[in-house]
């Protein structure tokens, strides 16, 4: 109710600890973010989930997450899935950082994988018909900032 009439033009679901379903302890955060995702889709507003946010998007649409090895404090090259909305902007990224303990190799239902790490973990997803996207890396943790990562945000929040 508070968000109605606020002028929000898009939602960024940020990183953080795991979802409660996967050992996290922020039940209220999980509930609020699911509400924001539903609300945004009803309003046809763009949503970007970053790391935990992408995990929430995947869980919301029924994709199961599993523990993944080699994804905390690591860098990954991306294998881009051609023909996705994000494909062109993602091809400009040489590699991305990684700080997550959970992920999935199987993206199904209303979501489609846009990019995988070379070990097969989905690193970017998009909804097949709505403006909902997710990336597993943290642009804000790059130093120096990677300008090509800004293009991902520009595409989603145009």
Where do the model's predicted regions map?
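Proline-centered loop/turn at the N-terminus of a beta-strand
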Residues: 46-48, 64, 112, 131
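Gly/Ala-rich beta-loop-alpha elbow adjacent to hydrolase catalytic centers
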Residues: 49, 53, 58
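Catalytic beta-strand/loop cores that center a nucleophilic Ser/Cys/Thr
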Residues: 84, 88-129
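Acyltransferase
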Residues: 137-158
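Flexible gly/pro-rich beta->alpha loop and the following alpha-helix that scaffold active-site loops
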Residues: 1-48, 61, 154-157
């Amino acid at each position: 109710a508070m968000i109605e009439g606020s002028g929000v033009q898009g939602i960024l679901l940020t990183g953080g600890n795991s979802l409660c379903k996967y050992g996290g302890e922020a039940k209220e955060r999980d509930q609020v973010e699911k509400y924001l995702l539903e609300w945004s889709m009803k309003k046809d507003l763009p949503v970007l989930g970053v790391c935990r946010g992408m995990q929430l998007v995947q869980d919301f649409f029924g994709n199961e997450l599993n523990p993944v090895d080699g994804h905390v404090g690591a860098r990954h090259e991306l294998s881009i899935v051609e023909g996705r909305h994000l494909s062109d902007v993602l091809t400009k990224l040489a590699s991305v950082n990684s700080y997550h303990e959970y992920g999935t190799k199987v993206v199904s239902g209303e979501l489609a994988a846009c990019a995988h790490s070379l070990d097969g973990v989905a690193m970017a997803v998009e909804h097949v018909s709505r403006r909902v996207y997710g990336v597993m890396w943290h642009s804000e943790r790059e130093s120096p900032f990677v300008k090509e990562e800004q293009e991902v945000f520009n595409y989603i929040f145009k």
